[in-house]
Amino acid sequence: MKNKLDLSLYLVATKGNKSEECFLNTLENAIKGGVSIIQLREKELNAREFYKLGLKVQKLCKSYKIPFLINDRVDIALALDADGVHLGQEDLEAKLARKLLGDEKIIGLSLKKLEQLEFIQGVNYLGCGAIKATPTKESSLLSLELLSQICDKSPIGVVAIGGIDKEALVELKGINLSGVAVVRAIMDAKDAFLAAKELKRKIYENLSLK
């Protein structure tokens, strides 16, 4: 699967205050609108709750034949036999995650410094940001200049993340990205299908999709 990875519209999904039914409906509508990959990110759930929710999201992703990744938790990814995992700089090292998960799984890594490109062995794609201020990353922004430098020097695909909406996509034009990752632009939208569809249109208009 990793050789055919479509990162164009990457959804980082968190259940939040939604009911499980509403959450799953939102994801399904987002997939129908053009989401190409889903990462389940649940910082507040315990391992059992995360696993149970993961089973349902995984089933949905399988039915639409899109990759399903787990945020941070290599153990949950292994238990689910998920398509892969996305790791932060403070999580298990990517090379160790690769040993545990095997060669066919997808591993993504958060990165925001050029020097971190030296340590991406075993990684399939990079997530870089935040591009815009978000509730959790108000003071941790990545400049567009640095994002562009990372994209130009990275041997693997780069996804921009952090406060990205359809307006922000125009600012990313000309940067050698493989896609964008969104959270609120879809998860908080009144209509996830239309939100995803419009984002996808803007992505194709503005990004080269390396």
Swiss-Prot record:
Pathway the protein takes part in: Cofactor biosynthesis; thiamine diphosphate biosynthesis; thiamine phosphate from 4-amino-2-methyl-5-diphosphomethylpyrimidine and 4-methyl-5-(2-phosphoethyl)-thiazole: step 1/1
Catalyzed chemical reaction(s): 2-[(2R,5Z)-2-carboxy-4-methylthiazol-5(2H)-ylidene]ethyl phosphate + 4-amino-2-methyl-5-(diphosphooxymethyl)pyrimidine + 2 H(+) = thiamine phosphate + CO2 + diphosphate; 2-(2-carboxy-4-methylthiazol-5-yl)ethyl phosphate + 4-amino-2-methyl-5-(diphosphooxymethyl)pyrimidine + 2 H(+) = thiamine phosphate + CO2 + diphosphate; 4-methyl-5-(2-phosphooxyethyl)-thiazole + 4-amino-2-methyl-5-(diphosphooxymethyl)pyrimidine + H(+) = thiamine phosphate + diphosphate
GO CC annotations on file: cytoplasm
A single BP term in Gene Ontology: thiamine diphosphate biosynthetic process
Domain of life: Bacteria
Binding site for 4-amino-2-methyl-5-(diphosphooxymethyl)pyrimidine: Q39, L40, R41, E42, K43, N71, S110, K137
Protein purpose: Condenses 4-methyl-5-(beta-hydroxyethyl)thiazole monophosphate (THZ-P) and 2-methyl-4-amino-5-hydroxymethyl pyrimidine pyrophosphate (HMP-PP) to form thiamine monophosphate (TMP).
Family listed: Belongs to the thiamine-phosphate synthase family.
Protein name, entry field: Thiamine-phosphate synthase
Gene (UniProt): thiE
